[in-house]
């Protein structure tokens, strides 16, 4: 769906956004007042690759050498290694499930939609603030809002489930959903997807616990309508869900930085080389 037209006409899946102010999704557009004759290569880089703290870098060096990562797809490694870092357990990645194209869908969604919906504030606070600011991504969690509490009482659902429902009402499909605490939030998300045509760009479902956790994760894994990242079993938690999003943001930022560097190198290579002039004796 066109990200501009959806604000002017009603489109299925974006009904809640009709009439809202438009948001530009172009990440490298120069202002009209810029010097259009100045090549992009001479302008300062906007994006720089993610630079971890030295202790964090050493941790990931140990993780990279701590097991054989060749069986795992290359595009999943950032997320999987961050999950090992979060859990302190190399076996944490063995039960992970990624639907086909989930990582690419998540990266594209973060860069285009720029909004993350979480079930609890602990997931929200686990997201790297510097990456959110660098990429211009907003987060929203309604679990403690009065409106969420009233909806929870009215419909007899948990506040986490009500927060997910309110997120669907507020943002429509333009959102990445990250659930790390409540199985009821996964249950509500899959219900909205199947019964109401909700199509979030990615659903991350990694709650921890013993009541309903296995079942809701398995139900999410079978929810073919949307890209999804989850696992099997009882392990998980808010730090896990936040780590997945952090991994996606790191890959998104590194991708932007690499693309920008490539474009600048191409611009420089395309510039005609200066031809020295020979002095002519008078």
Indicate residue ranges for each PLM-predicted region.
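Short glycine/serine/threonine-rich phosphate/pyrophosphate-binding segments
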Residues: 123-126, 183-189, 210-214, 237-241
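Long, charge-dense
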Residues: 131-172
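Intrinsically disordered, low-complexity repeat/linker tracts enriched for polar/charged residues
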Residues: 10, 21-22, 260-268, 272, ...
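Cysteine-cluster motifs in flexible loop/terminal segments that predominantly coordinate metals
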Residues: 2-8
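Active-site cofactor/substrate anionic-group-binding motifs, chiefly glycine-
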Residues: 93, 99-145
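Electropositive, gly/pro-rich neighborhoods at or near active sites that engage anionic ligands
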Residues: 39-115
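C-terminal functional extensions of proteins
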Residues: 211-263, 275-282
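Buried hydrophobic positions in well-ordered alpha/beta secondary-structure cores of metabolic enzymes
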Residues: 119, 204-205, 244
């Amino acid at each position: 769906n066109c990200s501009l037209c959806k604000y002017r006409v009603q489109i299925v899946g974006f009904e809640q956004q009709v009439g809202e102010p438009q948001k530009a999704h172009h990440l490298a557009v120069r202002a009209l007042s810029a010097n259009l004759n100045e090549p992009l290569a001479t302008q300062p880089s906007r994006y720089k690759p993610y630079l971890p703290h030295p202790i964090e870098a050493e941790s990931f060096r140990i993780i990279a050498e701590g097991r054989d990562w060749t069986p795992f797809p290359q595009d999943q490694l950032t997320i999987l290694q961050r999950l090992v870092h979060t859990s302190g357990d190399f076996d944490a990645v063995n039960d992970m499930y990624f639907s086909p194209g989930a990582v690419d869908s998540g990266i594209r969604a973060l860069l285009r939609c720029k909004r993350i919906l979480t079930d609890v504030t602990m997931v929200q606070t686990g997201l790297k603030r510097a990456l959110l600011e660098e990429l211009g991504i907003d987060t929203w969690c309604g679990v403690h809002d009065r409106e969420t509490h009233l909806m929870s009482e009215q419909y007899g659902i948990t506040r986490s489930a009500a927060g997910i429902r309110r997120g669907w009402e507020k943002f429509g499909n333009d959102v990445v959903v990250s659930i790390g605490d409540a199985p009821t939030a996964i249950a509500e998300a899959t219900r909205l997807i199947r019964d109401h045509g909700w199509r979030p760009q990615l659903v991350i479902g990694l709650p921890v616990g013993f009541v309903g956790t296995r079942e809701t994760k398995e139900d999410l894994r079978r929810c073919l309508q949307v890209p999804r990242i989850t696992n099997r079993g009882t392990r998980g938690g808010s730090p896990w869900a936040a780590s997945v999003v952090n991994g996606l943001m790191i890959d998104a930022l590194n991708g932007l930085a690499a693309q920008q560097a490539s474009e600048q190198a191409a611009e420089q290579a395309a510039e005609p080389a200066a031809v020295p002039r020979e002095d002519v004796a008078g």
